[in-house]
Amino acid sequence: LVILSFSKPVFADTISTGGGNKIHFINLKSKSGSDAILLESNGHFGLIDMGEDYDFPDGSNPLYPDRWGISRANEDTIEDRLFRHLKQVGVKKLDFILGTHVHSDHIGTADEVLKRYPVDRFYLKKYSDERITTQWRLWDNLYNYDNAVRTALERGVTLIQDISDQDSHFKLGNMDI
């Protein structure tokens, strides 16, 4: 008996920048704006943003209320697509992950990435919603931020939240970050 299993391929835009360096743009090509960027150099990998996930607060905790605008639609999530692409590329470990900002469509899947892959460093600014001018744009940002930070600490990942000049430049394989 032979059982064949095929996974759905992920079509990501990939740019080769020379010297074995690649940049993979993984997005939904939808209205949500959820995306992820995988950097690859000499067998080293880094992930910038992790996109929206399937997890959202149910409103039972007053710290994480159920709000209008929280993404609950499967077409707005990138979680499955991200993990399929990481597997297709052969990622076993991430040197770093970086959340560009704390909106759920950029860090929603961070806790799942931290659970599935060894990660050396996690760059994520401290949570602040002071520049958000309307309550509906708060979405489930704090919920996803707290999940990501908690998971990083549980996994022993170096969490860098105050990015100094020393932290802001480093190597990923042959790539200067």
Show which residues each predicted segment covers.
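Bacterial N-terminal signal peptides
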Residues: L1-S5
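Non-globular, low-confidence helical/coil segments that flank catalytic cores
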Residues: S7-I177
